[in-house]
């Protein structure tokens, strides 16, 4: 079954600044094969390699979701936080954008207990808070906000993910180490100052520019949605029909 895949062009990558690496002095020799050259002391990524590698990464994302797999989007640096969360939410997947919690993958049991605590707090504060003192309620709200910030994006994950998508492997080295330990494949954007070690599907490119980050996130999110429609298509569900169904129900009520 030939499934759709989000399309992108070399020109889009150029316009988003995907080819701009870091200062040549900060380079990591392990990325040498993906570097085209340098311009004014900045390494330029070889986009003729990025294009097929990005395409390969998107296929893996799509196929993982088509098989019913879960994807965890990870990007905790300031400029990645919002696009990572939005992209994951758009395709009903999961994200971590606050800071990587050690043990998120390797100690899922403990993490899922914290998620349960968050759900209990939500429930309590929504319904059963009448008998609480102001101080108790305040403490609960504080705990809820803290848990929501770090776990909100994975509260519905329900287990370790089947694939991880990462922006900035230098910053997210802990996530990569945990994924490697569990044999979870990693798709990641790797800039010229980082090592691609531990990354199964490398996307060589700029990991700092807002436009580049937005482009990767959008493409990965769309690939996941393509996988979802393939999965539903295989199950005989018509996505077009899903859009109208809820309105009919409200009419009856």
UniProtKB/Swiss-Prot annotation:
Gene Ontology CC: one annotated term: cytosolic small ribosomal subunit
A GO molecular-function annotation: structural constituent of ribosome
UniProt keyword list: Ribonucleoprotein, Ribosomal protein
Family annotation (Pfam families): Ribosomal_S2 (PF00318)
InterPro entries: Ribosomal_uS2, Ribosomal_uS2_bac/mit/plastid, Ribosomal_uS2_CS, Ribosomal_uS2_flav_dom_sf
rRNA-binding listed as a keyword: no
Entry's Gene Ontology BP terms: translation
Record-stated family: Belongs to the universal ribosomal protein uS2 family.
UniProt cross-references to HAMAP family, sorted A to Z: Ribosomal_uS2_B
Protein name: Small ribosomal subunit protein uS2
